[in-house]
Amino acid sequence: MRYKSLVKRCRLCLILVLLGGAFAWWWWQGRLERSQDGPIRAAARRYGVDPALIKAVVWRESHFHPRVRGRAEEIGLMQLQEEAAREWAAAEHLLGFEHEHCFDPGTNTLAGAWYLRKLLHRYAQTDNPLPYALADYNAGRSNVLKWKQGAATTNSVAFVEQIGFPGTREYVRTVMRRYAHYRPLFPPDSPTGQRREGERPR
């Protein structure tokens, strides 16, 4: 009887430890996901891009870790390449800008939001610019132009199916799912209901 009682107690302790670990992990993940909301909101206001979209890209690119460096020298929260970062700096007339400045969350999200807005404008004549912009962000404009043929020229559903890189296709779908997940956390700022860049009707 004592042995069975001891086993039950051990099992209960193990369950409590596992539950405690799961709660700690959930709490830490939630805190991490909220850790960059300040810079994300500021960049969204500055460039009129939906903060939920910025956050979805940050989640996919760096999982909210600002010191990440990619294999192609992309850096920071939104994994910005030097060319895109310098393009933003030139547009904003920033003197003495260096790519390394994009390790700063505020700088990175500003540059990334500016670049996302540019890509969304680039595909404004499609039925939904977002998949095109995300594919461009991940694989570059030259590849998007290869895939943007026939019905996929303006039909975003056809375009996603026509993406030639499985990794890019999954990137687009993953970010769009995460974007939908984050949208309830960022209600529209304007009482008029005017949509921001990247935002679709709810």
Model-derived segments and their meaning:
Residues 1-7:
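N-terminal Lys/Arg-rich, disordered targeting/topogenic segments
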Residues 9-25:
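Hydrophobic membrane-insertion alpha-helices, especially the h-region
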Residues 23-202:
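Catalytic glycan-binding domains that act on GlcNAc-containing polysaccharides
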